[in-house]
Structure formats: C-alpha cells, structure tokens
A protein has these predicted regions:
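The feature marks the mature, well-folded catalytic cores of soluble enzymes
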Residues: 1-251
C-alpha cells in the first residue's frame, strides 16, 4: 500500500500565527486564556491545553479581570474589545489579517449602502465565530445568507452589497451571486451599481480546492482529517468527495 500525504495539508497561516502567539506567551507565563478554540483540531487544542492554554467562551469573558486573553484568527466583534477595556484585560490579538480587512470592508460598505437605502448581505454560516465578528461590525444590520433558500429575506428592489465569510466555497458563493442576479433581472433591475459583489474569500482557502481536486483524482482512496466544527474542513472535504467518491472524513 502506498500512502501520500498532501504536501499542502495543515493549518492556514492565520491559525499558525495564533498558535505561535500562544506558544510564545506560554513560554513566559505557563498560563493563558483563549476566547474559543484556537483551532478546530482536538489534538492541537489538547497539546496547547497541556502547555497552559485555557479555553473560555464569550459568556465567561465578562467574569475575568486584569488578565491576558488571546483572540484567535476568526476575529471578534467590537463588543469583545469593549468588555476587555472595561475589565482591564490585555488582548493578544491574533485575528487573521484577511478577516480584519473584511471587517473593515463591511463597515465601509455599510456606510455607503445606507446612503442609498440599500442592504448588506453576508454569505456565511450562522453562529460561526467569524460571521459573528463580521455582523458585529454593523450591529447585526445585515441579511445573513447560508443557502439560496435564505434569499427570500432580501428586498430585491433595494441595492445590495454582498460579502462572504472568508472560508466559504467559491463555487457556492458564485451560485448565490447568480441567483440574486436572476431575481433582480426578473424584476427588470439591472443597474450594476446597485448590486456590488465583493471578493472576500481567503485566497489560501479558495486556492486549495483545485489542488485538492487534482490530489483526489490521482488516488484510489482519500482520508480527509479535520475537526468536525471546521467550516473550512467541511468545504474542502466536499471538494474531495465530488472528485473522488472514495473519500472519507475522519476527525
């Protein structure tokens, strides 16, 4: 039996950066709080836990004072920073720069679309940490779309600025875009300035799909290892499964 490990497998650069930041702090203090799982990988979370990393949730945060807390790569809403300031919590911010850029884009887009009585649409997974952070930038005043069925919430007569969670499938994002265009065309609304689709997908993630398809096609069986809670992992596994039906998900 010949086994090949995909040379591109592993954590994304944002997660690697967060882990490195945690490790550096743990070398100094042997204890650090982390707001949510640093990565959707039980083995890695266990390893860091043994080094002194303690995972807390957002409800816990308000009960901590005068300490250090790591912000993971997913990013956070403004409310998290407000609590930290009020409780004298020092934040070690490992928010992914791609996510931070998207947060800024959504804030600016919200200002612009509000001037023309438009609406913000975010394509993403409900309850996902990144999505919570994105919606928090505009106090939740957006339409969250997880599937084509969710588009019924939209007012297609009004301008639309659309953004995507960074780890979603490019193919699925394109399908959402095309469906919105179709419905607007049916209403005879074709002004391109009133439907702005922002390319906010992470290049590292979106670039993995074609690589994985090639990798999957040249092997008899694919064993895909990922955390069950990883949106990125689920999306990439589906790419493998579509290319090679003998693909199996293990967490």
């Amino acid at each position: 039996m010949e086994i090949e490990i995909d040379k591109y497998s592993g954590f994304c650069f944002g997660v690697v950066y967060a882990i490195q930041m945690a490790e550096e702090e743990l070398k100094e203090s042997n204890f650090l709080l982390c707001l949510g799982d640093i990565v959707h990988n039980n083995k890695e979370v266990e390893r860091l836990n043994n080094l002194g990393l303690k995972v807390i949730n957002h409800d816990d945060l308000k009960d901590y004072h005068d300490c250090k807390v790591l912000i993971r790569a997913h990013g956070e809403p403004p409310s998290t920073y407000k609590i930290a300031m009020e409780n004298n919590i020092q934040l070690l911010d490992a928010s992914c720069p791609v996510v931070l850029k998207l947060q800024h884009q959504i804030k600016e887009g919200y200002k612009n679309v509000s001037e023309i009585d438009g609406q913000i649409v975010v394509y993403g997974k409900k309850g996902h940490a990144e999505v919570i952070g994105l919606l928090g930038q505009i106090e939740g005043d957006a339409v969250l779309v997880s599937s084509i069925e969710d588009l019924d919430q939209l007012d297609f007569n009004r301008p639309i600025y659309m953004y995507s969670q960074t780890t979603k499938s490019p193919k699925d994002y394109l399908e959402i875009k095309r469906e919105i265009e179709k419905r607007r065309t049916n209403l005879d609304i074709n002004d391109p300035l009133q439907f702005v689709v922002n390319d906010t997908l992470c290049r590292q993630v979106s670039g993995r799909e074609p690589q994985l398809k090639q990798f999957s096609a040249k092997h008899d069986v694919i064993i895909f290892v990922s955390g069950k809670k990883s949106s990125n992992g689920k999306m990439l596994y589906e790419s493998c499964k579509n290319e090679n039906h003998n693909s199996y998900f293990i967490s």
